[in-house]
Amino acid sequence: MKIILIGTVEFSKEMLRTLIENNFKIQAVITSSNSEINSDYSDLKPLCDKNDIPCHISDDINSNRTIELIKNYEADVIYCFGWSRLLKKDLISLPPLGVIGYHPAELPKNRGRHPIIWALVLGLKETASTFFIMNEEADTGDIVSQVKVKIDGNDNAKSLYKKLSSAAQEQVIEITNN
């Protein structure tokens, strides 16, 4: 399976590393330039360079230039992890298997930004690690994989993030194998 990964945060790097370590074929990575407003920004280029994966910078994922670039790779699936802008239909419709996104919440509940913080603020006892087929709206597509994650009384944002990330790493391997 030919994969393109779109992402720009630490979670994107973790998922990319997981896919590489499990010998999946990454055609290319699309990332953005560093942003002062994104505290979780992570440079994916060094990991791509180390593994001979083309890495492209796009600050407008929906531009004709970026869509043509992605189209030329003829990917079977696009993984979009840690990208804070909505994707347009022209991009979403490219890969035959769709664009798969990730949200660290029990969709359809807790859509939108900062779901880990909200899970803690709301006093939830559990949340979920959720992969879904992306559409033009935020966090609304069909669920591909959802694993519940228990929230303990002593969890904070960092510890809950680690639990969700660990679950997601197992899920992305399973999804990609199937």
What positions do the PLM features span?
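N-terminal beta-loop-helix "entrance" segment that forms/cooperates
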Residues: 35-52
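Acidic, metal-coordinating catalytic cores used for nucleic-acid/nucleotide bond scission
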Residues: 34-37, 62, 140
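A generic structural signal for well-ordered alpha-helical segments
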Residues: 19, 48-52, 70, 124
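Donor/substrate-binding cores of folate-linked one-carbon enzymes
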Residues: 22, 77-178
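Internal alpha/beta domain cores that form substrate/cofactor-binding pockets in large enzymes
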Residues: 2-4, 27-32, 54-73, 78, ...
